[in-house]
């Protein structure tokens, strides 16, 4: 952590202690219950904040090995987060490109390929459409490269896998995380060693 910021936060906490309060505000304010219960506000926040900014989709330990995957709901969208054969974390909408059926129903597992339960279109865990029944007779003109899973921007940082579920946006992860990078790295969310005993 930046030393000046660290000292500022310590001084702020000591000031609260001296003032015998837990609050930085001069007066306590109450928000309308509607702010917490409104479906309209919820949908606006989900689309304008959570769908547009990086969100934690998984911890790295959840998809440690190639083929590991988890299914998540991020900002109201079902996604698959997986690790491909090269060890790269990837994220896709959990939707078959043929008829829009949900590809994965399990919460987690290990698969090199995802097969749609509806018409058996099959995708590599790197997103490419690799096979479909009756391709030559039913879809002779199909360009398989155009029917890969819809990929999401995905990045691995601070022990987490982050995704942006608005596929029309590009977020500069380096710039986005710059203000907290030093502190987040110092905490080390990737590895945690605890002095414990499992003896019973």
Task: Label each residue range with its predicted role.
Residues 1-106, 152-155:
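N-terminal pre-ligand scaffold of iron-sulfur
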Residues 191-200:
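Single conserved hydrophobic/aromatic residue that forms the stacking wall/gate
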């Amino acid at each position: 952590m930046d030393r000046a910021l660290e000292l500022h936060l310590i001084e702020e906490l000591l000031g609260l202690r001296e003032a015998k309060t837990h609050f930085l505000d001069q007066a306590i304010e109450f928000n309308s219950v509607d702010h917490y219960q409104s479906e309209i506000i919820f949908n606006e926040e989900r689309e304008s904040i959570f769908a547009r900014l990086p969100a934690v989709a998984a911890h790295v330990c959840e998809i440690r090995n190639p083929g590991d995957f988890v299914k998540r709901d991020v900002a109201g969208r079902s996604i698959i987060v997986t690790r491909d054969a090269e060890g790269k974390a990837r994220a896709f909408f959990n939707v078959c490109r043929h008829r829009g059926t949900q590809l994965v129903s399990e919460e987690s597992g290990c698969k090199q390929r995802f097969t749609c339960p509806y018409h058996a279109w099959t995708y590599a865990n790197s997103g490419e459409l690799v096979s479909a029944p009756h391709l030559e007779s039913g879809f002779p003109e199909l360009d398989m490269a155009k029917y890969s899973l819809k990929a999401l921007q995905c990045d691995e940082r601070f022990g987490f896998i982050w995704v942006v579920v608005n596929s029309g946006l590009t977020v500069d992860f380096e710039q986005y995380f710059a203000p907290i990078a030093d502190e987040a790295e110092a905490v080390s969310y990737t590895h945690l060693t605890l002095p414990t005993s499992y003896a019973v």
